[in-house]
Amino acid sequence: MANVLVAMSGGVDSSLAAALLQEAGHQVTGVTMHLWDDDEQGLRESLCCAAEAATSARRVCALLGIPFYVFNYQREFRRHVIEYFIRAYTHGLTPNPCVECNRMIKFRALLDRARALGFDAVATGHYARIVRDDCGRYQLWRAVDTEKDQSYMLHMLGQADLARLLFPIGEYTKQQVREMAAARCLPSANREESQDICFVPDGDYRNLLRIEAPESLIPGPIVDLEGREIGRHRGLPLYTVGQRRGLGLGGGEPRYVVAIDPARNALIVGPVEALNRERFIVTDARWVDDAPPAETFHCQVQVRAHAEPLPARVSAQPDGRWLVELERPQRAVSPGQAAVFYDGVRVLGGGWIARPEVG
C-alpha cells in the first residue's frame, strides 16, 4: 500500500477521494493549499482556496482519523496564476487560470513537495481517469461522468506526473459521489461546489483588473471588419472574443467581438458569422505520452472547458507550433484558451490557442 497525500478543498469530491483511499488500505494524509487571502478581494466562503476550505477539510480528516496539514502557496499562486491572468487580459488574450493553477501549483509545486516529504503519490478529487496500457505507459482518460469531466484542465500532465497521481473518483458520477459521501457520513456530502475562478469575487474578472491593472484600461477605437471606427471601447482587457453585450454600439445588426488587436488598441467587431473559425494555431503543446502521436494526425479538439469536441487535422509547423484544421467551423475560438486533443476518451495533449494575425 502507498503513502498518499490527498489535496483537499473541503468539498465532497476530495473528501470522498481520501475516504476511498483509506478504505483501500493506503496511508492517507490530507492537505489544503492556502492560495489566496479571503479578505484580499472579499472571497465567498465556498471558494476552494478560502479559509473555510481548510476548516472543512480539517473536519473531514478528523472524522477519518488521518493527519491534516495546510501548505501555504500564496506567493506561488500570485506569481504563476494571478499575474498570468492579468497579463493575458492586458495582452488581448482570454486566460484559463484553472489550467495554469493545475500546471504550476497542484501538479508541480505540490508533487515536488510531496516527493520531498516522502509520499509515494498525490491524489485529488478531479473527475478524470488514469489508465495503464499494455506497454505500461500511462494514459489520461475522460471521467465516467462526462458532465463533470475535468480532463481538459489536466492535458498538460506527462508520464512522470501520471505515475505519481491518483484520481479516485474518476470512475463515478457526481450523484454517486454524493451518495457515497452521505453513506460515510462525510460532512461535505452536500457542500456547495467551489467556483471555477477562486480569486475572482462574484465572477466578475473586470473588477480584479480595475484593482490590479488600472493602467491597462486605456480607451480606444471599436472598428468593423472594413476598419471603420464605429465606437469606442473602455479598455481591451474588459472584452473577450464572442462578446456581444456591453459594446455600446446601439441598435441595428448585432455585432460581436471578433478579434482584439493590442498593437492598435483596437476592438474588432463583426456579425456572428465572423466568429466562425476553421483553422487556428496552437503554441506550447504538451503531450501526455511526452511526444506527439505523429507530425500530422487526426483527433477531436476541444477549445473550451465545456465545448463540444470537434474532428480536426493537426499538423506540426516548422516553428514548433501546431496547425489545427477543423472539419466544420467552431464559433468564438478564443486566443489564450487551451485547445486539447482527444482520441475518443483519451487525452493526447494540448496547448494554447494563438492570436490570429490581424490586418
UniProtKB/Swiss-Prot annotation:
<feature type="region of interest" description="Interaction with tRNA">
    <location>
        <begin position="148"/>
        <end position="150"/>
    </location>
</feature>
<feature type="binding site">
    <location>
        <begin position="7"/>
        <end position="14"/>
    </location>
    <ligand>
        <name>ATP</name>
    </ligand>
</feature>
<keyword id="KW-0808">Transferase</keyword>
<feature type="binding site">
    <location>
        <position position="33"/>
    </location>
    <ligand>
        <name>ATP</name>
    </ligand>
</feature>
<comment type="function">
    <text>Catalyzes the 2-thiolation of uridine at the wobble position (U34) of tRNA, leading to the formation of s(2)U34.</text>
</comment>
<dbReference type="InterPro" id="IPR046884">
    <property type="entry name" value="MnmA-like_central"/>
</dbReference>
<dbReference type="GO" id="GO:0103016">
    <property type="term" value="F:tRNA-uridine 2-sulfurtransferase activity"/>
</dbReference>
<keyword id="KW-0963">Cytoplasm</keyword>
<feature type="site" description="Interaction with tRNA">
    <location>
        <position position="337"/>
    </location>
</feature>
<dbReference type="GO" id="GO:0002143">
    <property type="term" value="P:tRNA wobble position uridine thiolation"/>
</dbReference>
<comment type="similarity">
    <text>Belongs to the MnmA/TRMU family.</text>
</comment>
<keyword id="KW-0547">Nucleotide-binding</keyword>
<dbReference type="GO" id="GO:0000049">
    <property type="term" value="F:tRNA binding"/>
</dbReference>
<keyword id="KW-0820">tRNA-binding</keyword>
<feature type="active site" description="Cysteine persulfide intermediate">
    <location>
        <position position="198"/>
    </location>
</feature>
<keyword id="KW-0067">ATP-binding</keyword>
<dbReference type="GO" id="GO:0005524">
    <property type="term" value="F:ATP binding"/>
</dbReference>
<dbReference type="Pfam" id="PF20259">
    <property type="entry name" value="tRNA_Me_trans_M"/>
</dbReference>
<protein>
    <recommendedName>
        <fullName>tRNA-specific 2-thiouridylase MnmA</fullName>
        <ecNumber>2.8.1.13</ecNumber>
    </recommendedName>
</protein>
<feature type="site" description="Interaction with tRNA">
    <location>
        <position position="126"/>
    </location>
</feature>
<keyword id="KW-0694">RNA-binding</keyword>
<dbReference type="InterPro" id="IPR004506">
    <property type="entry name" value="MnmA-like"/>
</dbReference>
<feature type="binding site">
    <location>
        <position position="125"/>
    </location>
    <ligand>
        <name>ATP</name>
    </ligand>
</feature>
<dbReference type="Pfam" id="PF03054">
    <property type="entry name" value="tRNA_Me_trans"/>
</dbReference>
<feature type="active site" description="Nucleophile">
    <location>
        <position position="101"/>
    </location>
</feature>
<dbReference type="GO" id="GO:0005737">
    <property type="term" value="C:cytoplasm"/>
</dbReference>
<feature type="disulfide bond" description="Alternate">
    <location>
        <begin position="101"/>
        <end position="198"/>
    </location>
</feature>
<keyword id="KW-0819">tRNA processing</keyword>
<dbReference type="Pfam" id="PF20258">
    <property type="entry name" value="tRNA_Me_trans_C"/>
</dbReference>
<keyword id="KW-1015">Disulfide bond</keyword>
<dbReference type="InterPro" id="IPR023382">
    <property type="entry name" value="MnmA-like_central_sf"/>
</dbReference>
<dbReference type="InterPro" id="IPR046885">
    <property type="entry name" value="MnmA-like_C"/>
</dbReference>
<dbReference type="InterPro" id="IPR014729">
    <property type="entry name" value="Rossmann-like_a/b/a_fold"/>
</dbReference>
